[in-house]
Swiss-Prot record:
<dbReference type="GO" id="GO:0004239">
    <property type="term" value="F:initiator methionyl aminopeptidase activity"/>
</dbReference>
<dbReference type="GO" id="GO:0046872">
    <property type="term" value="F:metal ion binding"/>
</dbReference>
<comment type="function">
    <text>Cotranslationally removes the N-terminal methionine from nascent proteins. The N-terminal methionine is often cleaved when the second residue in the primary sequence is small and uncharged (Met-Ala-, Cys, Gly, Pro, Ser, Thr, or Val).</text>
</comment>
<dbReference type="GO" id="GO:0005737">
    <property type="term" value="C:cytoplasm"/>
</dbReference>
<feature type="binding site">
    <location>
        <position position="338"/>
    </location>
    <ligand>
        <name>a divalent metal cation 2</name>
    </ligand>
</feature>
<dbReference type="InterPro" id="IPR050247">
    <property type="entry name" value="Met_Aminopeptidase_Type2"/>
</dbReference>
<protein>
    <recommendedName>
        <fullName>Methionine aminopeptidase 2</fullName>
        <ecNumber>3.4.11.18</ecNumber>
    </recommendedName>
</protein>
<feature type="binding site">
    <location>
        <position position="302"/>
    </location>
    <ligand>
        <name>a divalent metal cation 2</name>
    </ligand>
</feature>
<feature type="binding site">
    <location>
        <position position="222"/>
    </location>
    <ligand>
        <name>a divalent metal cation 1</name>
    </ligand>
</feature>
<dbReference type="InterPro" id="IPR036390">
    <property type="entry name" value="WH_DNA-bd_sf"/>
</dbReference>
<dbReference type="GO" id="GO:0006508">
    <property type="term" value="P:proteolysis"/>
</dbReference>
<dbReference type="GO" id="GO:0070006">
    <property type="term" value="F:metalloaminopeptidase activity"/>
</dbReference>
<keyword id="KW-0645">Protease</keyword>
<dbReference type="InterPro" id="IPR036005">
    <property type="entry name" value="Creatinase/aminopeptidase-like"/>
</dbReference>
<feature type="binding site">
    <location>
        <position position="233"/>
    </location>
    <ligand>
        <name>a divalent metal cation 2</name>
    </ligand>
</feature>
<keyword id="KW-0963">Cytoplasm</keyword>
<dbReference type="InterPro" id="IPR036388">
    <property type="entry name" value="WH-like_DNA-bd_sf"/>
</dbReference>
Amino acid sequence: MAVQALPEINKLSVSEEGAANAAAKGQAAQGTAGNDDAENDESDEDKEDEQEVADGAAAAGGKKKKKKTKKKKKKGTAKVQSDPPRVPLSTLFPNNNYPEGEIVEYKDDNAYRTTNEEKRYLDRMNNDFLTDYRKSAEIHRQVRQYAQKELLKPGRSLTEIAEGIEDSVRALTGHMGLEEGDSLVAGMGFPTGLNINHCAAHYSPNAGNKMVLQYGDVMKVDFGVHVNGRIVDSAFTVAFDPVYDNLLNAVKDATNTGIREAGIDVRMSDIGAAIQETMESYEVEINGTIYPVKAIRNLNGHTIGHYLIHGGSTGKSVPIVKGGDQTKMEEGETYAIETFGSTGKGFVRDDMEVSHYAKVPDAPNVPLRLSSAKNLLNVITKNFGTLPFCRRYLDRLGQEKYLLGLNNLVSSGLVDAYPPLVDVKGSYTAQFEHTILLRPNVKEVITRGDDY
């Protein structure tokens, strides 16, 4: 989920305190989980049959007679994901051994960390949260694989796409979010962003939205998954017309550059400079006109905290252009490395109808005069904490005629509204994003998959 560089918009942050109350990657669950146990069971049973025949023959003092052993049925069967995804991930991985992300060794001055015994021990002692992160990431991979195959097609409505993604995420976490507090255990990390063409971020369809995905559109698909507050944030761009391929390639390459450069003690300014150099080496030709791909200079990557999508008040931003500050990345931090490219000005502003909201963490007590605002704040606190939400999520909970109360919460400073961010009309924007963990001994690209 995008964070806009200050001062254009405040960071979207969520409070740990409020929420705490509450095979290969992407393919691993597609038929492999459970096979090993089943095969081992069958092998052991066959050996027992052979031994019984041999023992019987020896006791009789005669020749060994070959006995045709019956083939035992496997006790376990391959567990596969359904289409659409509805099998909880805990069923596919009963031992909670979820696929790890892409493991990248540190380089240069930090190369020693990979083999340093002290760092390896520290990593083992502090990796309890990895199970939650890896579960979130595997859910993201499986859901986006389904979306790419079945949902993201011309002619589909944005509402159908968003609800298809979100219903799948909830089903795989095993928490549908209809009971009070259930969404705080596991579910959506933030609303599904479906940002078309010049819209770069923070657009999700509200009730009654009639927008339909077209063949000539360039759409950014940005959604988050959390398990026990461990949020993974990952995004990709789809375009059906190959004329936009270079735009997508530029941004994907830039994101991978940012991931490669990121690491412990690395300065944000150095990462931003490398990202911009990579992205702006590309150009794209559309209808006979050549456009340079520009990095959107007021959008950034960001830290992710426990129930904190943008790291809270102590969060850090990862620029995608040169000239950033000298802040360094540190051991143990989690980052969303995301880059945005545009054929327009390379600068976004607020526009269009708001869909994204989040409760302000540590907000002061403000007297609310509207009873509807008081009731709505209670619903938000108990169901989302400070995780971002959208109007459709309130609709799911049966809330009605809540806009007046919601606007009152925004004007009172208790809830932040996050309008869509757009470049100039007629331009096209693209986004790619991954979540990375700066573990003591290695860097783990937790959301990496076969697709991007």
